[in-house]
Structures are given as structure tokens and as C-alpha cells.
């Protein structure tokens, strides 16, 4: 009975001992680590620890040049880099020479761009800008105040429109150096002869690319200009100046064509006016020598005025009164030779026939032949 109890006690103590030992082992053994580089479980005897993450020895290498890292390394976006590649990829670069800027170098800042002291100069006259000088940051290039004003004057001469000669969408306003305190006075350098700007000569392919883009949009955005500059191998500034000159050229041609159309219209109007004026003047010259014929009312007035004193009707034989057959038309001795000579009748007839051709007015008033025959009949019947 005691032996059984001792065995049970020994068995129970053995179980407790094994449980406590397993608990100790569980605390001592750490969970398996995962490599930060390849995301695999680390089964190697030795490992490397970087920024609270575990790495295989073979995974600790530069992500750019694939060289193993032994002493120092740079960590960015869960990747490792050597010093050279890290500075090449992520270090601050100069806005002028696009080279990395060392941490111990002095710099000049213009808005978001950083420059070496030697690179902080005007791109036209290459004069180094000092503290307090006024300048313009245009298309990532620095322009001093004098060269900027000259460029605007040239653009205004080429293109008088305010839209072309004004600032572009990405052109910054006139500003001062970031390190300047107060408004400084820039050196004008009027006596100094500045070197002339090099003239850019476009090739056929570059000109075709520019014209194709100009047909799509005469005023492209900044991204399109940067794309054209990358395709043609030119600077963005050259691309912008070409588009400005092309817009000015098209406007000049449009104004010239409009002026020609106006001149042509004015010439046509003048010619038509001269034609109409000459025709009317010619007709007036033709009609002026001829007087207008009298109207029937005027003819009737003439009849009444001429024969208002005649008591007899027109074309009828006057009444035969005693002693009046010799002078039926008044007391005037118009036919005093009728009895002396018979041939005088024929002469009188010829005279009246000659006078009958005077015109339509006399024929309408009365024919003297009728009066002559009536007088002759009355003479022979009496």
C-alpha cells in the first residue's frame, strides 16, 4: 500500500517536472524570423538585423547595383542602397547642372529649386546673381531683370498681341533671391558687351513635329511642350519661343488677308459707282439736245390762244355775207390779185403747199388749202 503511494507520488512529481521544463523551453525558444528582403523564413545559423527587421546575409545588398553591403548602407522604401547609388537617386540635385548637392555645400534657393552658388546665374548673359538681385524663373531657367525685359520687347515686336507677348501659364512673376533681405539694386552692366545668344536652327524632322503639334493646338500646354522638347532634343524654352513666333506669323497672315479683302471690296464699290455715274451722265447728254414735245393740253392751249378771236369753226366755209366773199378772212388784202390773174391761184396753192410742211402743229390747227378751195368755190358760184 505504501509502495503504491510512493510510486504515484513519484509519477506525479515526474509529470510536474516535465511540464515545468517544457514551459521553460517555450519561453526560451523564439518564433521563426522572416527575412525583410525575400520574405522567407530564416533558417540560417547567423542573421542580420537592420531597423528592427531581420535579413539573410545574402539579401543585404544594394537594390540598384546589387553589390553586397558590409559596413554601411542606406534604407529607403524597404530597400537597401549603397552610398553612391543613394546619393545618385535620392539626393537633392542642382536646378542648373542637375548634379547632386553635397550636404556641406552652400546653396541658393528659388521657390522649389535649389542651385549651387556657381550655377545660380542668368541663362542669357551668364552673370551670377547675387543677394538682392531681381530675376525671373521661367521654364526652370533663371533670367535677370534686364534680359527678361529685352525678351519681352522682342516678343512684343514680333507679336503685338497681348496674349502672345504676355506670360505663359508656367511663368513665374518677377521675384528676388531667397537669401536677399530687402530690395537690392541689380547691376545693369550697360557698358559691358554681352555675348549674343546662339541661333537655333531646326531640322526638317523637328519642324515637322512642331507643325503637326501646331495644327492640333496653337497654344499647347506645358506637358505637350516638354514632350516635344524630349522628342526633338531641344529645350522647352526653344519650343515655347517657336510656338509664339508661329502664332504671331499666323496672325500677321490673317491680318494681311483681311486687309486685301477689304481693299478688293473697296475697289469693286468704286468701279461700280463710276460705272453707274458714267451711264447716267451719258443718258443725260443724249437727252439734253432734244426738247420735250408739248403735251396735248399745251397744244389745246395754243389753239385757243391763236384762234380765240376767230368767230368761225375750224375747217368750215365761212358764211357768205354780201360784200364779204372777196375777203372771207378779214379786211387784210391777202388775196387782192385773185381777179387780175388766174395764174396767181396756182402760185398761192404752191405757197400754201410749201407752208403746209411746217409741222404737226399747223396741220392740227387748220389747213389753208381747205380755206382756199372754199373761197374759190364761193367766188365762182357768186
Curated annotation (Swiss-Prot):
Places the protein is found: Nucleus
Domain LIM zinc-binding: 33-92, 92-154
Major site of localization recorded for this protein: nucleus
InterPro entries attached to this UniProt entry: HD (IPR001356), Homeobox_CS (IPR017970), Homeodomain-like_sf (IPR009057), LIM_Homeobox_TF (IPR050453), Lmx1a_LIM1 (IPR042688), Znf_LIM (IPR001781)
Biased composition (Low complexity): 256-269
Disordered: annotated segments: 161-208, 252-285
One Gene Ontology biological process: dentate gyrus development
SUPFAM superfamilies: Glucocorticoid receptor-like (DNA-binding domain), Homeodomain-like
Xref: SMART domains: HOX (SM00389), LIM (SM00132)
UniProt-recorded Gene Ontology molecular function terms: DNA-binding transcription activator activity, RNA polymerase II-specific; DNA-binding transcription factor activity, RNA polymerase II-specific; metal ion binding; RNA polymerase II transcription regulatory region sequence-specific DNA binding; sequence-specific double-stranded DNA binding
Keywords, alphabetical: Activator, Deafness, Developmental protein, Disease variant, DNA-binding, Homeobox, LIM domain, Metal-binding, Non-syndromic deafness, Nucleus, Repeat, Transcription, Transcription regulation, Zinc
Secretion signal span: none
Tissue expression: Isoform 1 is expressed in many tissues. Not found in heart, liver, spleen and testis. Relatively highly expressed in fetal brain. Isoform LMX1A-4AB is expressed in testis.
Function: Acts as a transcriptional activator by binding to an A/T-rich sequence, the FLAT element, in the insulin gene promoter. Required for development of the roof plate and, in turn, for specification of dorsal cell fates in the CNS and developing vertebrae.
Protein name in the entry: LIM homeobox transcription factor 1-alpha
Organism: Homo sapiens (Human)
Amino acid at each position: 500500500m505504501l509502495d503504491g503511494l510512493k510510486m504515484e507520488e513519484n509519477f506525479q512529481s515526474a509529470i510536474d517536472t516535465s511540464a515545468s521544463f517544457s514551459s521553460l523551453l517555450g519561453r526560451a525558444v523564439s518564433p521563426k524570423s522572416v527575412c525583410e528582403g525575400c520574405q522567407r523564413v530564416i533558417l540560417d545559423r547567423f542573421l542580420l538585423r537592420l531597423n528592427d527587421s531581420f535579413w539573410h546575409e545574402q539579401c543585404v545588398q544594394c537594390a540598384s547595383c546589387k553589390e553586397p553591403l558590409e559596413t554601411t548602407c542606406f534604407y529607403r522604401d524597404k530597400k537597401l542602397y549603397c552610398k553612391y547609388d543613394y546619393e545618385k537617386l535620392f539626393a537633392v540635385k542642382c536646378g542648373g547642372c542637375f548634379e547632386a548637392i553635397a550636404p556641406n555645400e552652400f546653396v541658393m534657393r528659388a521657390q522649389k529649386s535649389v542651385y549651387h552658388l556657381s550655377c545660380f546665374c542668368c541663362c542669357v548673359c551668364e552673370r551670377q546673381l547675387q543677394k538682392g538681385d531681381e530675376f525671373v524663373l521661367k521654364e526652370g531657367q533663371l533670367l535677370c531683370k534686364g534680359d527678361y525685359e529685352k525678351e519681352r520687347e522682342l516678343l512684343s515686336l514680333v507679336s503685338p498681341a497681348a496674349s502672345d507677348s504676355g506670360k505663359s501659364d508656367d511663368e513665374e512673376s518677377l521675384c528676388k533671391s531667397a537669401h536677399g533681405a530687402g530690395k537690392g539694386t541689380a547691376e545693369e552692366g550697360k557698358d559691358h558687351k554681352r555675348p549674343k545668344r546662339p541661333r537655333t536652327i531646326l531640322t526638317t524632322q523637328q519642324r515637322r513635329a512642331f507643325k503637326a503639334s501646331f495644327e492640333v493646338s496653337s497654344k499647347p500646354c506645358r506637358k505637350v511642350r516638354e514632350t516635344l522638347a524630349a522628342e526633338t532634343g531641344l529645350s522647352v524654352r526653344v519650343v515655347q519661343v517657336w510656338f509664339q513666333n508661329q502664332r504671331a506669323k499666323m496672325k500677321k497672315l490673317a491680318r494681311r488677308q483681311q486687309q486685301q479683302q477689304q481693299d478688293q471690296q473697296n475697289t469693286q464699290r468704286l468701279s461700280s459707282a463710276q460705272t453707274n455715274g458714267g451711264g447716267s451722265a451719258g443718258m443725260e447728254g443724249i437727252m439734253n439736245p432734244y426738247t420735250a414735245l408739248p403735251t396735248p393740253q399745251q397744244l389745246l392751249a395754243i389753239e385757243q390762244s391763236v384762234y380765240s378771236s376767230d368767230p368761225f369753226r375750224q375747217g368750215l366755209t365761212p358764211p357768205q355775207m354780201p360784200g364779204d366773199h372777196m375777203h372771207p378772212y378779214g379786211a387784210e388784202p391777202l388775196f387782192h390779185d385773185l381777179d387780175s390773174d388766174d395764174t396767181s391761184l396756182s402760185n398761192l396753192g404752191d405757197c400754201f403747199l410749201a407752208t403746209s410742211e411746217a409741222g404737226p402743229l399747223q396741220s392740227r390747227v387748220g389747213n389753208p388749202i381747205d380755206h382756199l378751195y372754199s373761197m374759190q368755190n364761193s367766188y365762182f358760184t357768186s
